[in-house]
Amino acid sequence: MTTSAASGEPGRQRVLILGSTGSIGTQALEVIAANPDRFEVVGLAAGGGNPELLAAQRAQTGVAAVAVADPAAAEAVGDVRYSGPDAVTRLVEDTEADVVLNALVGALGLQPTLAALATGARLALANKESLVAGGPLVLKAAAPGQIVPVDSEHSAMAQCLRGGTRAELDKIVLTASGGPFLGWSAEDLKSVTPEQAGKHPTWSMGPMNTLNSATLVNKGLELIETHLLFGVDYDDIDVVVHPQSIVHSMATFTDGSTLAQASPPDMKLPIALALGWPDRIAGAAAACDFSTASTWEFLPLDNAVFPAVDLARFAGKQGGCLTAVYNSANEEAAEAFLDGRIGFPDIVETVGDVLHAADRWAAEPATVDDVLDAQRWAREQARGVVEQKSVRRGLVTK
């Protein structure tokens, strides 16, 4: 049985979960249920894609503070305190929490991220898009150490960086599984179907993150996130392919030492660490078994076949709202691919076309409205590019 936010038991962290019905959210609830002496749930929020699951989660946790962005889904859940486009943000503002886990998908997580930071709660951030889109605004709103990453790669970096000072850091090595199409040629990728792109070889993730991993856009977003979270120059962040997904990232220091964080691919480990930061949660996930033979491979990324990381590096170096443009153009193009309107390579091609027409958005955003305007522009541009590609490929007719 949970206690109210206002009367949380000493030593128990009050956790507000945004995106509770998604992959990260459901695993976070499992971590919390396994550690009732450490955590209690004080609120749940979801977009509304799975109202039945949200209703079940509410019954399981006993919380009254629930938000649903989709009003129709809110009716299906029943007796929802907050509904509509700003429901999640209002929930964050009204709920006392020690930790806000933002596991929403996409750029819609920006306003809740800023609201969470304004409350002073620790932000366990799985919604990388809000940081990528609103970078300068998010960093300005955050107190030192207030944001704790949930992504396995950035969680790994945070752990590795405990082993040295910032002045001693030489570079960050960001690892990538390579996705389901590692080793495929550019010609091979033309025949990829949404079903193929929805199967990841090592990780269990939501559909959008799985597709982003297949295109390597996810790694591009993580590159930008690395720069923003840890203040590392883009030229000092290497990306290497590690198909086994055991080493989640590495930090190389000026004396030649490299520290790596290794664990079997299981998101419960970084979720638990973010919820309990800086403390570890015993038994969060299985450890590596070094008593059995295994091989860890590290391969160069083929940027010619998978240009998404190079595009992200370009957007990040240009600065301003270009990282928001990168993300929003991808969201629009990815949706078009899933709908069968464009081919798989067209996703990243669309992002590149939009980015290279986005000079007007290179200025740093002064307000959230600046970011939202850049996102709207990017989506409109992407829709135009998608339509042109669809017509050329004969997938739609004018």
From Swiss-Prot:
Name of this chain's protein: 1-deoxy-D-xylulose 5-phosphate reductoisomerase
Keywords on record: Isoprene biosynthesis, Manganese, Metal-binding, NADP, Oxidoreductase
Organism per entry: Mycolicibacterium smegmatis (strain ATCC 700084 / mc(2)155)
Molecular function via GO: 1-deoxy-D-xylulose-5-phosphate reductoisomerase activity; manganese ion binding; NADPH binding
Function according to Swiss-Prot or TrEMBL: Catalyzes the NADPH-dependent rearrangement and reduction of 1-deoxy-D-xylulose-5-phosphate (DXP) to 2-C-methyl-D-erythritol 4-phosphate (MEP).
Major enzyme class: oxidoreductase
SUPFAM superfamilies in UniProt: 1-deoxy-D-xylulose-5-phosphate reductoisomerase, C-terminal domain (SSF69055), Glyceraldehyde-3-phosphate dehydrogenase-like, C-terminal domain (SSF55347), NAD(P)-binding Rossmann-fold domains (SSF51735)
Protein's UniProt keywords contain Transmembrane helix: no
Pfam families reported in the protein's UniProt record: DXP_redisom_C (PF08436), DXP_reductoisom (PF02670), DXPR_C (PF13288)
HAMAP family named in the record: DXP_reductoisom
Transmembrane portions of the chain: none
Keyword Oxidoreductase attributed: yes
